[in-house]
A protein has these predicted regions:
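Metal-ion/cofactor- or nucleotide/acyl-coenzyme-handling active-site neighborhoods
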Residues: 2-196
Length: 196
């Protein structure tokens, strides 16, 4: 059996408890402060697909739109004035190779899995930490997490996580740019997602 030193054991128990009860923790409280903060507004979710151009980003910048960036989006910064309002990453490999770049992205908010903060020592300045549910054994489809202060279904893509966060923040019109083709998503009054 694995013998843990007592301090590590206490920390592990505490971390497990927080992840199970994140909505009661300071992390959940911080997330709840942004619930519906952008009610009825529109935003652009910028994925890093081959269709993404610096022209797309420049338009978002010139129109002063809210936008989400993800993963290695900082590689586009040389080509555009645009910077994401919000940044999301769930990939430990990207953190391991790009922590300084990620910390220097000038976003208003960065959304990072608390799991990676606790278990992989990923520290992002002023992050909004959420509980990522990576459980792939469940046979349910990707569920839309309306309450991201409880947990986020992170078995899909980081784009999906961005949509979840945008909906939680109250954005109604969500445009996806740089995915295989551009999508427009509307969140209706019941919180249901409609893809055009």
């Amino acid at each position: 059996s694995m013998i843990m030193n007592p301090l590590k054991s206490i920390v592990a128990r505490y971390q497990g408890y927080i992840l199970t009860n994140i909505q009661k923790s300071k992390y959940g409280k911080k997330l709840r402060k942004i619930k519906n903060a952008h009610k009825g507004e529109r935003c652009f979710i910028v994925a890093n697909g081959p269709s993404l151009t610096s022209d797309d980003l420049e338009k978002i910048y010139q129109n002063n739109e809210y936008s989400f960036g993800m993963n290695r989006i900082y590689k586009m910064f040389d080509e555009t004035n645009w910077r994401p309002s919000f940044y999301v990453c769930e990939d430990i490999n990207i953190f391991n190779e790009s922590i300084d770049e990620i910390n220097s992205i000038p976003s208003q908010m960065k959304f990072i899995p608390l799991n990676l903060h606790f278990y992989n020592n990923i520290n992002i300045d002023d992050a909004y930490y959420f509980k990522a549910n990576y459980d792939r054994n469940k046979d349910y489809p990707h569920s839309f997490s309306t309450e991201i202060d409880v947990q986020m279904d992170s078995r899909g893509t980081v784009t999906f996580t961005c949509i979840n966060i945008a909906a939680y923040m109250g954005f109604k019109d969500i445009y996806l740019v740089g995915v295989d083709h551009n999508y427009h998503i509307t969140i209706n009054e019941d919180g249901e997602t409609i893809v055009d």
